[in-house]
C-alpha cells in the first residue's frame, strides 16, 4: 500500500508522488512513516528526508518546517528543499567545508547571533551534502 507524499517549499513543489515509506528529520529524531500511519503533526529540523518509491530511495534536503500525516497523505511544508539528485556533490562539499570553518570561527567569538547564523548555515550545508550522497565527518 502506498501513500501520497508532497514536499512544498515557498517557491516550488519539490516532490508530489506516491511513496512506500518516508523517513523525516523531526525535532525528536528520525521519524519513519508507513502507510496507514496514525494522524500526526510534527516539526522538522534541517536535515535529510528519505522517500522510498518502487524499492528505490530518494534523498531530499529539508530546511526545517512541518509535516502532517493523515489518511495516507503526508504533506511537508518547509522553508526550503532540494532533491539530492539535483545537488552538485563537489559544490556541496566545498560549501560544507566553508560552513564548518565559519562555525569554528563563530564559536571563538562572543556574538550569539553570529553563532546561531553559523550553526544554521552549517546544518543547511550538511543536509545538502548528505542528500547529495556525500559522507559527512564531524
Swiss-Prot record:
Keywords, sorted A to Z: ATP synthesis, CF(1), Hydrogen ion transport, Ion transport, Membrane, Thylakoid, Transport
Membrane topology, from the record: Peripheral membrane protein
Protein's UniProt keywords contain Transmembrane: no
Name by which UniProt lists this protein: ATP synthase epsilon chain
NCBIfam families: ATP_synt_epsi, PRK13442.1
Species of the source: Thermosynechococcus vestitus (strain NIES-2133 / IAM M-273 / BP-1)
One CC-aspect GO term: plasma membrane-derived thylakoid membrane
Family matches, as PANTHER family: ATP SYNTHASE DELTA/EPSILON CHAIN, ATP SYNTHASE EPSILON CHAIN, CHLOROPLASTIC
GO molecular function: ATP binding; proton-transporting ATP synthase activity, rotational mechanism
Annotated function: Produces ATP from ADP in the presence of a proton gradient across the membrane. The complex from the organism is particularly stable to disruption and remains functional after 6 hours at 55 degrees Celsius.
Superkingdom of the source species: Bacteria
Family according to the record: Belongs to the ATPase epsilon chain family.
Matching InterPro entries: ATP_synth_F1_dsu/esu, ATP_synth_F1_dsu/esu_N, ATP_synth_F1_esu_C, ATPsynth_dsu/esu_N
Subunit composition and interactions: F-type ATPases have 2 components, CF(1) - the catalytic core - and CF(0) - the membrane proton channel. CF(1) has five subunits: alpha(3), beta(3), gamma(1), delta(1), epsilon(1). CF(0) has four main subunits: a(1), b(1), b'(1) and c(9-12).
Entries under SUPFAM superfamilies matching the protein: Epsilon subunit of F1F0-ATP synthase N-terminal domain
Pfam families named among the record's database cross-references: ATP-synt_DE, ATP-synt_DE_N
Major place of residence: membrane
Compartments, as annotated in UniProt: Cellular thylakoid membrane
